[in-house]
Design a protein with these regions (language model features):
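Nucleotide-activated chemistry modules centered on ATP-dependent adenylation/adenylyltransferase
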Residues: 1-244
């Protein structure tokens, strides 16, 4: 269920309807059901090792993992929004999901979000500190297909380590969108912001605005098109970013 947004153009929505046809076909494939069952078993296995929480970002992958956890009987969930650089539409996904699925939910906003040329954009350090206080064990939507770093993580560690669970680590992006369609789960509006299909939705990330990572596919231009007011507000607080 794509969440409506005034950011969407007519051409964006026309393209999204075409994508939904493919999502619907993949959602009916028996292979997806097998992947769902396996992911639920991984989460239950991880739970047998001790308390943990689902790490939310409200992007497509974390919504899938949150729903799989809910189906497995697990309810503990936390979000660590990145303060003033957080994508503002993540709250729409949060509200739509929690209105339908009862979770033991909390969130801690980062007081010192980072926008730099190194590491993660956003609130990675705040996440690490807060997750340690919560016991340090968590399940996330990390997938090998997203980056070379995450692929290495899956190759080296597999789906589960002592403190982390990547239940959908080997799912494709097509699998993720098919699952969202199959279970009518809320989908972040940004994934339909494709300039009428000229941008691959699989490249779009929804975590933060104004960051320096992942700009190779045209992230800055995309943000200027769809989040201009938010970008101006960030530049006003951090003028050094304007020239980057």
């Amino acid at each position: 269920m794509l969440l409506a947004s005034p950011r969407h153009t007519v051409h964006d929505l026309e393209h999204w309807k075409r994508l939904e046809i493919a999502d619907s076909m993949r959602a009916r494939h028996p292979g997806l059901a097998h992947k769902e069952d396996a992911a639920i078993q991984r989460l239950r296995s991880f739970a047998s090792g001790g308390n943990f929480f689902v790490s939310a970002s409200w992007g497509k992958d974390s919504v899938v993992v949150a729903h799989l956890a809910w189906r497995s009987g697990w309810r503990r969930m936390h979000w660590f929004p990145a303060g003033f650089i957080e994508n503002p539409d993540c709250h729409l996904v949060r509200d739509a999901f929690l209105a339908r699925f009862e979770m033991d939910y909390s969130e801690i906003e980062a007081a010192d979000p980072v926008v730099g040329d190194w590491g993660h954009d956003g609130a990675q350090r705040a996440f690490e500190r807060a997750s340690a206080k919560m016991g340090g064990r968590y399940a996330s939507g990390v997938r090998a297909e997203e980056s070379a770093t995450r692929k290495r993580r899956m190759v080296v560690f597999g789906h589960e380590t002592e403190n982390t669970c990547a239940a959908i680590g080997w799912w494709s992006t097509d699998d993720v969108f098919a699952y969202l369609h199959k279970h009518d789960l809320p989908i972040h509006p940004a994934y339909a912001c494709t300039r009428g299909g000229t941008i691959d939705r699989n490249r779009i990330r929804v975590g933060t605005i104004g960051g320096q990572g992942g700009t190779g596919w045209g992230r800055r231009e995309w943000e200027r098109t769809y989040y201009p007011a938010e970008l101006r507000a960030i530049y006003a607080r951090m003028p050094s970013l304007v020239q980057r």
